[in-house]
Curated annotation (Swiss-Prot):
Record lipid sites (S-palmitoyl cysteine): C315
Subunit-level organization: Interacts with MGRN1, but does not undergo MGRN1-mediated ubiquitination; this interaction competes with GNAS-binding and thus inhibits agonist-induced cAMP production. Interacts with OPN3; the interaction results in a decrease in MC1R-mediated cAMP signaling and ultimately a decrease in melanin production in melanocytes.
Extracellular side: 1-37, 94-118, 184-191, 267-279
Name of this protein: Melanocyte-stimulating hormone receptor
Membrane-spanning ranges: 38-63, 73-93, 119-140, 164-183, 192-211, 241-266, 280-300
Glycosylated residues (UniProt): N15, N29
CDD domains, A to Z: 7tmA_MC1R
InterPro entries listed in its UniProt record: GPCR_Rhodpsn (IPR000276), GPCR_Rhodpsn_7TM (IPR017452), Melcrt_ACTH_rcpt (IPR001671), MSH_rcpt (IPR000761)
A GO molecular function held by the record: melanocyte-stimulating hormone receptor activity
Taxonomic source organism: Panthera onca (Jaguar)
SMART domains documented for this protein: 7TM_GPCR_Srsx
Record bears the keyword Membrane: yes
Major localisation: membrane
Biological role stated in the UniProt entry: Receptor for MSH (alpha, beta and gamma) and ACTH. The activity of this receptor is mediated by G proteins which activate adenylate cyclase. Mediates melanogenesis, the production of eumelanin (black/brown) and phaeomelanin (red/yellow), via regulation of cAMP signaling in melanocytes.
């Protein structure tokens, strides 16, 4: 809702371009380079946000309904859905309020609007941080379930899971409040970028190690059945494809946003970096897309959850 422009705030206005602007165009000024600027229509942004809201609400409802899903792994998935839900709700809310203000339908004092903007920005930032944290927590949980299978239930207990979940939410709220309060400090942006890189490295290392263990296990089975190449190659290709999709979507959806933050530190006034800043709304849209994809990757692949989801949908009719 702030009209200062996306590059002057940590989150800034989610729709700094005019609704009538073309979707794809070349922006230029007299001294700077020609820039490729992708404009995301407000209707598309709101529609994606609503799809994400529906998906993640269904995930939360299904896990809450089925007691068989009341385990640490599904609690982490549920919290990821809540984080993605908050990202979508707060982004849609900010966009809707800003459009109402621009249309003159909603009137308010500047101080009140600014306070509302700060609250929503804290909510968006906190949800982003918690979403990244729970993606890392799910990776750690899966790693322990594979490499410490016999001790998994003694390592990942419900009390420990609840403590981890509580710590993530508290840390997300505190860090997002500090990030928004000191958004114009270089250290804040560096912390956010470093956090993203740390989560990316953590997930890559854990999932690559899990893939290596799966391939090693497949080779052992192949030796017993004397079918080494077909079994090993089939599992290896399937695992590599899954790993590529998982990490690729994570990097594609989150990477541009954190590239934007990195360039705000490295070259805030450079014309070429300015071309990147013009696509800030596109980067936020990619994060919304990640909130849509997360349930497909982490939740809906579970047969038990899909069955419960069908029951939830049937009960709602």
């Amino acid at each position: 809702m702030s009209v200062q422009g996306p590059q002057r705030r940590l989150l800034g206005s989610l729709n700094s371009t005019s609704p009538a602007a073309p979707r794809l165009g070349l922006a230029a000024n007299q001294t700077g380079p020609r820039c490729l600027e992708v404009s995301v229509p407000d209707g598309l942004f709101l529609s994606l946000g609503l799809v994400s809201v529906v998906e993640n609400v269904l995930v939360v409802a299904a896990i809450a309904k089925n007691r068989n899903l009341h385990s640490p792994m599904y609690y982490f998935i549920c919290c990821l859905a809540v984080s993605d839900l908050l990202v979508s709700v707060s982004s849609v809310l900010e966009t809707a309020v800003m459009l109402l203000l621009e249309a003159g339908t909603l009137a308010g004092r500047a101080a009140v609007v600014q306070q509302l903007d700060d609250v929503i920005d804290v909510l968006v930032c906190g949800a982003m941080v918690s979403s990244l944290c729970f993606l890392g927590a799910i990776a750690v949980d899966r790693y322990i379930s594979i490499f410490y299978a016999l001790r998994y239930h003694s390592i990942v207990t419900l009390p420990r899971a609840w403590r981890a979940i509580s710590a993530i939410w508290v840390a997300s709220v505190l860090s997002s409040t500090l990030f928004i309060a000191y958004y114009d400090h270089t250290a804040v942006l560096l912390c956010l970028v470093s956090f993203f890189v740390a989560m990316l490295v953590l997930m890559a290392v854990l999932y690559v190690h899990m893939l290596a263990r799966a391939c090693q296990h497949a080779r052992g089975i192949a030796r017993l059945h004397k079918r080494q190449r077909p079994v090993h190659q089939g599992l290896g290709l399937k695992g590599a494809a899954t790993l590529t999709i998982l990490l690729g979507i994570f990097f594609l959806c989150w990477g541009p946003f954190f590239l934007h933050l990195s360039l705000m530190v490295l070259c805030p006034r450079h014309p070429i970096c300015g071309c990147v800043f013009k696509n800030f709304n596109l980067f936020l849209t990619l994060i919304i897309c990640n909130s849509i994809v997360d349930p497909l990757i982490y939740a809906f692949r579970s047969q038990e959850l899909r069955k419960t989801l069908q029951e939830v949908l049937l009960c709602s009719w």
